[in-house]
């Protein structure tokens, strides 16, 4: 049974402005594994990756119903499976989780669905 659904839309240019003012912003948002992937990319790809992880983590927080206020970005990790699809590899939710991240122009959209294991 679906117990939560969250969606987030993020402008990549807004993330770029924050990142340019404070490059440590990425360390606040990304886990150690996500940060290693982020650092392997050229600048433009870094921005879309960071915006995608931001949107995915915001969507997760909305789906679980707490918002980021009760979670930290470090509580949630989004990596890719062998096909390149994003997956939630770390979160406080114990059921099944499904994530989709889509990029289009200056925008990134993420959707998270949480399903009870029952």
From Swiss-Prot:
GO terms for molecular function: holo-[acyl-carrier-protein] synthase activity; magnesium ion binding. The keyword Acetylation does not apply. Mg(2+) binds at residues 8, 58. It catalyses: apo-[ACP] + CoA = holo-[ACP] + adenosine 3',5'-bisphosphate + H(+). Its EC number is 2.7.8.7. Its main location: cytoplasm. It is found in: Cytoplasm. Belongs to the P-Pant transferase superfamily. AcpS family. Transfers the 4'-phosphopantetheine moiety from coenzyme A to a Ser of acyl-carrier-protein. NCBIfam families: acpS, pantethn_trn. This is Holo-[acyl-carrier-protein] synthase.
């Amino acid at each position: 049974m679906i117990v939560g659904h969250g969606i987030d839309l993020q402008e990549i240019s807004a993330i770029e402005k924050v990142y340019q003012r404070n490059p440590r912003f990425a360390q606040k948002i990304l886990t150690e594994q996500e940060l290693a992937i982020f650092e392997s990319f050229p600048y433009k790809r870094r921005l879309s990756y960071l915006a995608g992880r931001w949107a995915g983590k915001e969507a997760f927080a909305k789906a679980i119903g707490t918002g980021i206020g009760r979670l930290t970005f470090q509580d949630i990790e989004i990596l890719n499976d062998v096909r390149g699809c994003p997956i939630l590899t770390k979160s406080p939710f114990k059921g099944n989780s499904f994530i989709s991240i889509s990029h289009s122009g200056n925008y990134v959209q993420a959707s998270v669905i949480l399903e009870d294991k029952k």
